[in-house]
């Protein structure tokens, strides 16, 4: 039996959020085949661990039913989620992880089991790059262009020492690790290009974010009102103003429609913009729902026809929300800044891309109506095969073999 160790770095795997849905649940599909076992190794800071102890224990019990073992390695509060891992913090970081990774290294040498490490983040991957000897066991699951993201939001200086360090580490990870997973071909191409690395599809694998389609089919869709939906955080990448501006533009031409927003962002970050006088005309047609549990999301999706992902800065990823929209039978509307999603919307004919901010509203509304009528002719079934969680064992088997 093959063994997979999912490595999580000071992130809440127990909150049923992204790590649970995008890392744990897909690997559970392999466990269910009877040919794999799964351990979760979490480097968790002591304050974080103590604060969330009850939730952690509950998740342990739930996953125990599948034979999943969770190992929490307690470390001091260190610069990952709450303090960015700049070069000045590296000695502190290495001090925290060194003994744990060396322990894993010695333990793995004594077994004949076929072992893989699925590394969740750049921060976790760095420790294994430095201290774990057998790099052929490591699958690096990038998820996001972490370095570029921190440059774009101003956390890292483009030519600073921190970026130079991480660029060099990234190249070593790409070359030395067994495989690296990317969630869009544009993301993969951009990362390989900046390091002048030739594409090898067996080593640099394309794996889209998986979604449980059945979860979003639990409530029947009622899209007669042509409502628009946005789900997710509102901050650096997705600003509430860009969604309000879009709806303000089309609202008069679609008088029965609403804009529905489900977000985990705090109300004090949204209300000042939402209450601006420019949005007076649409305010009573906008619903904002805070901290909606994942189990309740299908009821909001079911009220909508279109799913929005409009960003002010360029990004090569394909976000979870884009695939959730597809799973719920919504029509995604993205702009060209959401490059990975825009490419898929065109390739599979499953959404529309707003190429030009000056596009006339009549043109936008006509395109929305056209794709709504023609969606049965799209390549939705083909897209589902590569994104449905329940089909994901077939995608992951060649990677973890």
Q: Where is each model-derived feature located?
A:
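Acceptor-binding helix/loop patch of EC 2.4 sugar-transfer enzymes
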Residues: 76-88, 136-171, 189
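Nucleotide-sugar-dependent
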Residues: 238, 293-300, 305-326, 334-343
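N-terminal subdomain of nucleotide-sugar transferases
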Residues: 1-64, 112, 245-254
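Carbohydrate-associated surface elements
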Residues: 186, 210
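A charged, aromatic-enriched C-terminal amphipathic alpha-helix characteristic of glycosyltransferases
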Residues: 355-363, 369-401
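Membrane-proximal helix-turn-helix segments that form the acceptor-binding/catalytic region
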Residues: 26, 95-106, 126, 140, ...
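Conserved donor-binding/catalytic core segment of Leloir-type glycosyltransferases
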Residues: 6-8, 181, 220-238, 243-251, ...
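Nucleotide-activated donor-binding/catalytic signature segment of Leloir-type glycosyltransferases, i.e.
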Residues: 263-265, 271-296
